[in-house]
Amino acid sequence: MRIGVLALQGAFVEHISKLRKLGVDNIELRQRKDICENLDGLILPGGESTAMRKLLIELDLLEPLKAMIAEGMPVFGTCAGMILLAKEISDGDSPCFGTLDITVKRNAYGRQLSSFRCKDRFLDKEIEMPFIRAPYAERVDKTVTILAEHDNKIVAVRQDNQLAAAFHPELTDDMTVYEYFLDLIEKRSLM
């Protein structure tokens, strides 16, 4: 199994560390030539979504990655990655990939100083959830499965091959969300 990690900005190093601990081969995606045919999945890390969107366009990564996601490549977006995947952004910003049928509210939990950690349920397991200038989903399509909520706000979802979390599982010791993503990849490879 080989997973590409978008490595333009944000918490990509932490995602790579998690993948290594799980024994998963990975490649940093920094430019178009880094995209290879033998990728089984993609991670879009947290960071600053506007800067990431700009770099995706400038480096000619947006369209090929969007096509891969549309063709069924499993993708996992955290925080800014959730915003990049969202079909709609409630503050009027243009969507980036626009492949995940949700509406997100950017910086919904306030500024950097308002960042926090909590424990909440991801599916049937309580896990630590670090929120850093995090979004949440205000609306989800009926085809979207809600995987986690915090204070009645939707903070993790799945739609087909797409997984998104408003929090940063890469900043904890828990592997639950990564194991869920790897399971998603394995099930897809059996199809």
Per-region residue spans from a language model:
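N-terminal beta1-alpha1 cap of cysteine-dependent amidohydrolase-like domains
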Residues: 1-58, 63-68, 175-179, 183-191
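A secondary-structure boundary/capping signal
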Residues: 8, 78-80, 100, 133, ...
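Hydrophobic anchor at the start of a short beta-strand
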Residues: 26-27, 75, 162
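Flexible, charged surface loops at secondary-structure boundaries
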Residues: 35-38, 70, 140, 158
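Redox-cofactor binding/interface segments in oxidoreductases and associated redox assembly factors
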Residues: 43-44, 77, 165
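Cysteine-nucleophile active-site neighborhood
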Residues: 49-120
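Amide-donor transfer/coupling interface in amidating biosynthetic enzymes
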Residues: 106-191
